[in-house]
Every structure is written in C-alpha cells, then in structure tokens.
C-alpha cells in the first residue's frame, strides 16, 4: 500500500542477474583448473554474524565458488587471529576472504583488517585498496557502494551530472561511495552529510539521488525528498519495539520516483559483489 508511487529498486532480482553471469564465469575458471575460493573468518557466537556468514557461503554454492570457513572462539588472542589471517594469505585455495565484523572488544579490528593481503581483500576495504580507489587505480571495490551504483544503473537512474546527497560518513558506505560517484565514469556531484551537517532537509530536497546510510530509523521523511528523486535505503537499525528498520520512512514511497526496499534492496548486491570481487581476482590470476 505504501509503494504505489515509486519504482522499486529491486536488489534481489538484480542479484539473481549477477549470479547468472558469475556462474558462467566460475564455470570457465573451473574448466581452466582455477576454481575461486572465498574464505570467512568468524570470531565468537554473535547470531547476526553467524547468519550473515552462512548466507555468504550459501551464495558461494549457488555460483560454484569454493567455501573456506575459519570459525574461532570468542576468547582467542590477537596472536591466534593474526595466525589465521596469515594462513589465509598464504593459502592458494583462498582467492579472497573477509574478517567478519564486529570482532570481540579485546581484539584490534583495524590491525586485523590491515593484516589481510590487499589482493585477497574481498570486501574492498583494506587501506591500500581504499587508497587505490582515491587514485582511480584498479583494486577490489567496496561491495556496498559498488552495489548502490550498479542498482541505480540497472534501473536507469541518471548518475552523470546528478546531485547525490549521501547521509552517513562510515568507512563501509558513505566515504567510499563518494569516491565512486565522483569518478569520471560516474560524474556525479556528491554532498556527504553527517551529524554536524546544517540544514539537512534543504540539502536533500535539492538532491536528485539520496543515499541514506546513517543507521537512524526513518530519518528520511517525505518532506525531505524532491518529487521524482531516487532514494536508496542502506541503513539498518532497530526501532523502539526492537524491529529492524531502515533509514527511509514509508511515506517516501509516495513522493520519490525510485526507492530501494530495505531489506531486499542494496543488501543482496553487497553479497553479490563480494563474490564478484573474488571472481575478478581469480580471472586476473589466469
């Protein structure tokens, strides 16, 4: 009932299209004796992290990528985590891998991520690869920003010349998305908004595209959106009742031209481009 006005940016259908392409590419790699492998490092018993990792390995099975799991207890030392990362760096069966976050508080997340071999960085978030993105050099791209750009293009939302308001400056979405969108291949103008941004509604009402990645429930309301604009909902948080909700209020569907559902919008593409990064790495090694 709330989705009458806007076209749905359907991430699930778009993911399925990507999977068809990946299956064909993985089959060619397998025929050449180079089946790619995705590894995950999971520390502790967080139910959300376990569910997310299960989903990643289920995706691997769908396209023919080998799965490698390293599940570790919550009380491991930094040294044991480092040894696990070093083992995957040296493992020829592992084309790319991720360290599932968050880690237990006694472990140094930044040190763990920096220890990953940048060429095996499936998330595209190693400092070296983010630096290559700044320089517009080839490197694994951050999965969620790449998924956002792909989703907009898939539904023919004009990016070149568009004013994009990005809400949130996190390292996984906001900051790298601004870098992607301002490349010559995208040619957007980006306003990166955060907690100290003044006059936010005025900024968003001027935007052709809004990407909400702040993690604030329903912060983007209908009065903040220019009629016909595209709105991408990336944020995930819980409301007062404990229900998972996005950053975009349901009323936005009556005003915007395109809206991504949450869930079912960007999330499926984040996982799809995790696999894409691994396949691209395997193809580069042929």
UniProtKB/Swiss-Prot annotation:
Keyword NAD applies: no
Classification via Pfam families: THF_DHG_CYH (PF00763), THF_DHG_CYH_C (PF02882)
Identification of the protein by name: Bifunctional protein FolD
EC number(s) on file: 1.5.1.5, 3.5.4.9
Gene3D superfamilies: Leucine Dehydrogenase, chain A, domain 1, NAD(P)-binding Rossmann-like Domain
A cellular component term, taken from the record's GO annotations: cytosol
Gene behind the chain: folD
Classification lineage: Bacteria, Bacillati, Actinomycetota, Actinomycetes, Mycobacteriales
Entry's Gene Ontology BP terms: L-histidine biosynthetic process; methionine biosynthetic process; purine nucleotide biosynthetic process; tetrahydrofolate interconversion
